[in-house]
Amino acid sequence: MTALNHTPLNAAHRALNARMVDFGGWDMPVNYGSQIEEHAAVRTDAGMFDVSHMCVVDFTGSRVRAFFEHAIANHVGKLKTPGKALYSCLLNPQGGVIDDLIVYYFTEEFFRVVVNAGTAEKDIAWFNQLNKQGGYGLTIAPRRDFAIVAVQGPNAREKVWATVPAARAATSELKPFNAAQVAGTPFGDLTIARTGYTGEDGFEVIVPAVHVEVLWNALQQHGVRPCGLGARDTLRLEAGMNLYGQDMDDTVSPLDAGLAWTVDLTAPRDFVGRAALEANGTRAAFVGLILQKENGKAGGVLRAHQKVVTPHGEGEITSGTFSPSMQESIAFARVPAAVQVGDIVQVQIRDKNLPARVVKLPFVRNGKVLAA
């Protein structure tokens, strides 16, 4: 049996009596007690997540912008100011999603990317292949010397500033999807991005791994609650945010995964997968579902891989859970393209067909329920 990878915070999680699970080969906390309370902390105050299993990759060289024009489906032409970030899919030639990632622009010779843990080795191999094939001459450096802590919630930024006073001046004016580099803090040189995976405001802090446990403990002392993968999943589902490997993979087009907004077909550039996307178009709708109640009760919980029956054909739930914020069972589903918001569809739960209503994503954003 292969030993699990550990983040630099593994001992800290165990000291907090976290329930640990194998998450794609990483030993990660699923909760530290009440998952519901962790979820609520992020929606109402501030919670933090160890996301150090994700991999920071630095790209340097004179042709780094040209490389990303070709490598990703979104358009790095939008990245004009230092620290600006872009969410994109990395596609294969068939238009399938190799990974979803965030690209940060710092200078014309330095871009930084954060990729998912389970796909990191595959992504890096693909980047190296594209770099070699295109003769871009870039240096591509995975940075496992970094850890990442995501601090999320309406009070997250204030609590980060209380913990790292030097960060306030550099980040108080940051708009969402922008980052700043903050040098010389007690926790080393930090990259602080106004990004997240919860539907709340907050920061994701890239920190030298040798300093992350001290930062984690300091954030806790300033009232930030440690949160595990369980709350992270219910929060991202409420927020309408995809999980790689569950809502899309290398056989699924971003156009069929609710990610058309991340694909830029306007610029005349030859990015990997473009020809396949243009040839195939959109084949399915990616929608939200809310399980309908009868006599005030739902007959089950929506879960991944349940079949969805519609008048236009069958679909499938890709992610499902019970929403703590809504007190409803919610899901994402890939269904025939003719399915519309407001339609009632049937979901096969055990041996029953139960009605669910099609809604526009997201379900919740900034603490407010949007899908009723």
Swiss-Prot record:
It holds the Pfam family GCV_T. Its EC number is 2.1.2.10. GO terms for biological process: glycine decarboxylation via glycine cleavage system. It is an enzyme of class 2 (transferase). GO terms for cellular component: cytosol; glycine cleavage complex. It catalyses: N(6)-[(R)-S(8)-aminomethyldihydrolipoyl]-L-lysyl-[protein] + (6S)-5,6,7,8-tetrahydrofolate = N(6)-[(R)-dihydrolipoyl]-L-lysyl-[protein] + (6R)-5,10-methylene-5,6,7,8-tetrahydrofolate + NH4(+). InterPro entries: GCS_T (IPR006223), GCS_T_bac (IPR022903), GCST_C (IPR013977), GCV_T_N (IPR006222), GcvT/YgfZ/DmdA (IPR028896), GcvT/YgfZ_C (IPR029043), TrmE/GcvT_dom1 (IPR027266). Keywords: Aminotransferase, Transferase. Belongs to the GcvT family. The glycine cleavage system is composed of four proteins: P, T, L and H. The glycine cleavage system catalyzes the degradation of glycine. This is Aminomethyltransferase. It comes from Burkholderia orbicola (strain MC0-3). The gene is gcvT.
